[in-house]
Every structure is written in C-alpha cells, then in structure tokens.
C-alpha cells in the first residue's frame, strides 16, 4: 500500500508517514518564530533565576510590599514570643440559641424619653 510513484503522479503515504510530515510542518513555523525571537532578544532565557541584582536582593532576606505587611509580620513575631493563656477549652460558643426567658430582664430607664411623651400631649396639637 505504500506504493510511491515518481514523476507527475501523486505519492501515496501510509498514515504514519502522513503524521510525521504534518508534525514536521507544524513545528517548522514555531521554530522559525523562535529563531526570530532569539535574534531579536539574545539575552532572553539565558539565566533562569534572573539578573545578578535580583538574585542578590532575594538572598538578603524577606522584603515587604508595604508598611502594612511589615507591621503584620512584626506582630506575628511578637505573638510567638509572648506566652499566652489559650482559650478555655470548656467554653463552647454557638451551641445555644437564646430564648426570651434566657435573657436578663431589661432595666427600666429612670429618665423618661421626650419622644415617648404623654398620650394627652399628642392630642392637644
């Protein structure tokens, strides 16, 4: 089935040969584009870690985006150093839903509100 005719007649190829030629054609434009980019930017991709300046800055230690990041990191360091009493293990929150009977009674106000005046005053307007 892989008969190949030379001359004006067409060439018959097997499925594998067709795939190989298609892959070569697909890779060729990519390689050409890659060569153009390498010619335009010769230093691109040489150092995987970046410039020497960047590597030096990264080796110095942690840097902060702004003063807020610095203060948050500083507060975390202080919290680690201070021994604090952990929360009560017996204290459980969110399990009990209060009812009106569970709530303490409100204390009546000693000063009467001017807004809640006498009913008689409202009728005499």
UniProtKB/Swiss-Prot annotation:
Q: Which N-terminal residues, if any, form the signal peptide?
A: none
One biological process term in Gene Ontology:
cell division
User: Can you tell me where the transmembrane regions are?
Assistant: none
What's the domain of life for this entry?
A: Eukaryota
Please give the positions of the paired cysteines in each disulfide bond: none
Coiled coil spans: none
Question: Where Phosphothreonine occurs along the chain?
Answer: 28, 99
Q: Would you name any one GO CC term? A: nucleoplasm
Ranges of compositional bias, category Basic and acidic residues? 1-37
Where is the PTM Phosphoserine found along the chain? 67, 109
The known PTMs are summarized as:
Phosphorylation at Ser-67 by gwl during mitosis is essential for interaction with PPP2R2D (PR55-delta) and subsequent inactivation of PP2A. Phosphorylated by PKA.
- A GO molecular-function annotation: protein kinase binding
Record bears the keyword Cell cycle: yes
Location (main, coarse): cytoplasm
Keyword terms of this UniProt record: Cell cycle, Cell division, Cytoplasm, Mitosis, Phosphoprotein, Protein phosphatase inhibitor
Region Disordered: what ranges? Answer: 1-52, 86-107
Which InterPro entries does the protein's record reference? Answer: Endosulphine
Does the keyword Cytoplasm belong to this entry?
A: yes
Compartments where found: Cytoplasm
Q: How does it assemble?
A: Interacts (when phosphorylated at Ser-67) with ppp2r2d.
Role, per record: Protein phosphatase inhibitor that specifically inhibits protein phosphatase 2A (PP2A) during mitosis. When phosphorylated at Ser-67 during mitosis, specifically interacts with ppp2r2d (PR55-delta) and inhibits its activity, leading to inactivation of PP2A, an essential condition to keep cyclin-B1-CDK1 activity high during M phase.
Family note: Belongs to the endosulfine family.
Entries under PANTHER family matching the protein:
ALPHA-ENDOSULFINE, ENDOSULFINE
- UniProt-recorded name of the protein: Alpha-endosulfine
- From the UniProt record, report the name of the gene that encodes this protein: ensa
């Amino acid at each position: 089935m892989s008969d190949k005719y030379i001359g004006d007649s067409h060439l018959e190829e097997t499925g594998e040969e067709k795939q190989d030629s298609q892959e070569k054609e697909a890779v060729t434009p990519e390689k050409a584009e890659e060569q153009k980019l390498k010619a335009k930017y010769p230093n691109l991709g040489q150092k995987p870690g970046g410039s020497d300046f960047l590597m030096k800055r990264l080796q110095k230690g942690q840097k902060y985006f702004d003063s807020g990041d610095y203060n948050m990191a500083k507060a975390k360091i202080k919290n680690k150093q201070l021994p604090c009493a952990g929360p009560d293990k017996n204290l459980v929150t969110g399990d009990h839903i209060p009812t009106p009977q569970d709530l303490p009674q409100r204390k009546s106000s000693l000063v009467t509100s001017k807004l809640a005046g006498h009913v008689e005053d409202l009728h005499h307007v």
